[in-house]
Amino acid sequence: MSNTQDSAVRRPSLAPEEYSVGWICAIPTELTAAMAMLDTLHGPLESQPKDDGNNYTLGSIGGHNVVIACLPRYGTNDAAVAGISMQRTFSNLRFGLMVGIGGGIPSADNDIRLGDIAVSLPSAQAGGVIQHDMGKKEDGGFRRTGFLNGPPTLLLTAIAKLRATRTLGKEIAEIVNEAFAEEDDEEWRFPEKEDDILFEDGNELDGNGAEGEHVVQRKERKSKNPTCFYGNISSGNSVIKSAKERRRLAEEEGVICVEMEAAGLMNFFNCMVIRGICDYADAHKHKKWQQYAAAVAAAYAKILLCIISPQALKPHRIVHFSVPFGQNSKFIGREEHLRQVLTALTPEEFERDCQRVAITGLGGVGKTRIALEAAFRIRDKHPDCSVFWISAVNVSSFDAGFLEICRQFKVPGINEDKADVKSLAKAYLSQETAGRWLLIIDSADDLDMLYKSVKESDGNGSSRSLAEYLPFSRKGSILFTTRNHKAATYQAGSNVVTVEEMIESDSLQLLETSLIEKGKGFIEDDAKKLVRHLTNLPLAIKQAAAFINQNKITISNYLEVYESSALSDQALIELLSIDFEDQGRYRSDQNPIISTWLISFLDIQKSNPLAARYLYIMSCVAQRGIPRCLLPPASKFDEIQAIGTLTAYAFITELEDQNSFDIHRLVQLAARNWLKTRGELFQRSGDALKQVSRIFPFFKHENRNICIAYLPHAQHVLTFQDFPEDSQESLRDLLHNIGEYYYRTGKYREAEEFYWRALELKKLALGEHHPDTIGSMNNLAVVYERHGEYAKAESLQRQTLELMKQVFGEGHPDTLGSMNNLALVYEQQGEYAEAEKLQQQTLELRKQALGEDHPSTLMSMNNLATIYEQQGEYAKAESLQRQTLELKQQTLGEDHPSTLASMNNLALVYEHQGEYAKAETLYQQTLKLRKQVLGESHPDTLQSMNNLAIVYRLQGKYIEAEGLQQQQQSQATLDEGRLSKPARKRRKKK
């Protein structure tokens, strides 16, 4: 063989897109003939798709790059598989050739002999190929169904030229003789004519003998050159051996040849069928003519290619689509986000620039899923646009992504030892010849990694940032996904699409579609509760669905587990830390929602330590309304940077007042768990305690709203219970101030708890004689008195008074305060003489020490007047209460709680003297102001309501009294935790 694979000129490998002709053979004999026709033999492909099972021979004929494949076995199915795989791997193929051997069907019009050539050509009956085993049996006959496509116009016009060539047969013979000129190539040359026997219909060869009297006598040809016939070729999976069937095909279908592969190709592979005749489609089968028949068919194909100008095969640019995940068939919602992304990404948006868009949002919110869906939609809408995906999780994955781009485009030089792959990829994509492309940079969170210059190992010691390798082309677009809003603005300017948690309806749909048993136990109310608990976060919902599927439970069952776990941080963390499989995430990713933010925590700790410190504190206080002043002081610039970092990761949200923040509930839980696993939670909770204690004020009438705003954070941080030694002073101060808040707002039971805790800690740390300890003893005794535990109050107050005398002296304001409080206890127990004596003594000492208009002095005046009233000395009581009220209005203001107490007490004196109209007016004023200042459910407000109702009854206004008492009872029911001191005893009139 003179022009075989062994002797043809060899060339290096070419890229798959450089091949324009596909050549398919059915058997090795046909492959040998095809290879003999190659002008040049090419090297094999550098790589081949894993789903392509073909084995290719590559070369060129007449300037065309040709790819040849041989089927593993006969049949239309194998031909179809081979053709599909070939077209996927070699995307620039313009047409194909099915070249090999077949069975000829001679007729009166077509004197077909062995060694002749049959070429598929459309006719009135068909497009050049029919499928003889595709049809229906009708009325004892057979009706073919279906229609196969014909050859492409380019080949038909070339065939027309060949048919006009008078010397075609001679040229074919010369090519065969030249290709198989070696001495051992005899079987490839023209066989003996006596082996060409055609039997009459119905008298085919039976066994190994021939029936000579039934042989068709044909005129001997003068030349051995093959003759070419054109018409329909019949193809199917069944072998034709019947003369009757052969005659039917010739007469009814115009068939000139039968074979077993072409029907599998015609409807999707633009090809022409060329067959060398090796038998007559009857029982007379032997292999003597197969080599020659294969050779002449291959020679015809070569001549055909040589008359088609290579320039007519204009190559089209190959389009690549390389993403790590399949399309999500259950993609839900996010249409507005996708619209924004797709609108901004198309080059038509601004043709003079490379479009850049960033998708940003909290980890687990679905950014990668949106980018993936965008990739598939762009492929569908713009099939000429290549799509590439790069994971920016680390430098290695970034480099691997650029290497894959180079491999896909067969960029020269990538296999060199010191190849700068990223520069090669950038240079290639930045050229207009690269065509349209979309580059997706996923997880572009680390600004340092992307924008900080690092020394490259390219031999020249240069330093470049990874971002400098991003290509620029007016035909290109880059889509980033990032958890970091700052990174998003770095990468895409104002073209940022912010993704938040799903709307509830989409969350419910995601939950339901993620379940295996979708209808089982799907109670919508429970489902709504669950997605709200999970903050409508897609990753958390997928995790919950995976747990439900794995354990074959219902949503209601999972909800019970979640809500019971929510009573304990650790139990909830364990539930939300259970791993699950997610085909739409990287294998290296942490799938559980509790783990997904760990990389972000580390990034923040590295890039902005102050932001990390803010996060630690926010993780230890209440989730909502975190005041800016709670955060450790820093310069304005540093504070803005730190807050900006946390908002950039969507961990916190700045509220409209710009002075407070909310932290995402699950992020807060994850941050606490992260601190715990690192052994830092104990110290960080102490830091948070210090900050809360620093800002939580000692209660005053003026700062009531501040205390209300800060109380949830104080309560939350105290749930940690154990704190470092350096936080103990802050703990004592905070307990004291919370107790004071509760006391001043009438929540005496709560006040007792916090006063008692503060007292116990102060005893341990400071000792019983320390002023702070004594102060806490006094506070606790006062609370006992307020909710009627007079014996305990008297005992503790006596201890307090003795200690104060020892430590401060008898004239000290704190000692006088204790004397006042003990007098109140005497009064409440009906010991008016002792109360009056002690209160008079206190009042005189306060006047001397503090002055007549000091609030403490006024308090003693009020208390003494009350004792007079309790003993029926109304004139003295009224005079002293009037004096007290006027001084309080001047010094404290008309709406101060102490002023309101004096108003109430003066009205009580009026009532006891029978001056009901004056009492009613003053009670009404007091009640109105107490509602405004203290709130409707404060014990003092309820006391005013009770007093006014009594005055109504005393005046016969029973309807007004009944209505007011119902209001009082409803307010008391709403706040059962409060226990006010009993209403003052009312002295009966004599």
From Swiss-Prot:
Region of interest: Purine nucleoside phosphorylase domain: 22-304
The entry's keywords: Hydrolase, Repeat, TPR repeat
Reaction equation(s) it catalyzes: ATP + H2O = D-ribose 5-triphosphate + adenine; dATP + H2O = 2-deoxyribose 5-triphosphate + adenine
Residue spans of biased composition, Basic residues class: 981-990
Molecular functions (GO terms): ADP binding; hydrolase activity
Segments forming domain NB-ARC: 334-563
Enzyme kind, highest EC tier: hydrolase
Region Disordered, annotated ranges: 965-990
InterPro entries to which the protein is assigned, alphabetical: NB-ARC, NLR-like, Nucleoside_phosphorylase_sf, P-loop_NTPase, TPR-like_helical_dom_sf, TPR_rpt
Ranges of the TPR repeats in the UniProt entry: 732-765, 774-807, 816-849, 858-891, 900-933, 942-975
EC number(s) from the headed UniProt entry: 3.5.99.-
Any GO BP: nucleoside metabolic process
Cited Pfam families: NB-ARC, TPR_12
Free-text note regarding domains: Has an N-terminal purine nucleoside phosphorylase (PNP) domain, a central NB-ARC domain and several C-terminal TRP repeats. Expression of the PNP domain (residues 2-308) in E.coli slows growth considerably; the PNP domain has ATP nucleosidase activity.
PANTHER family assigned: AAA+ ATPASE DOMAIN-CONTAINING PROTEIN-RELATED (PTHR46082:SF11), ATP/GTP-BINDING PROTEIN-RELATED (PTHR46082)
Biological role stated in the UniProt entry: The N-terminal purine nucleoside phosphorylase (PNP) domain cleaves the N-glycosidic bond of ATP, and to a lesser extent dATP; has very weak activity on adenosine and deoxyadenosine and no activity on (d)ADP or (d)AMP.
Protein name from the UniProt record: Nucleotide-binding leucine-rich repeat (NLR)-like protein
Organism encoding this protein: Hyaloscypha variabilis (strain UAMH 11265 / GT02V1 / F) (Meliniomyces variabilis)
Species lineage: Eukaryota, Fungi, Dikarya, Ascomycota, Pezizomycotina
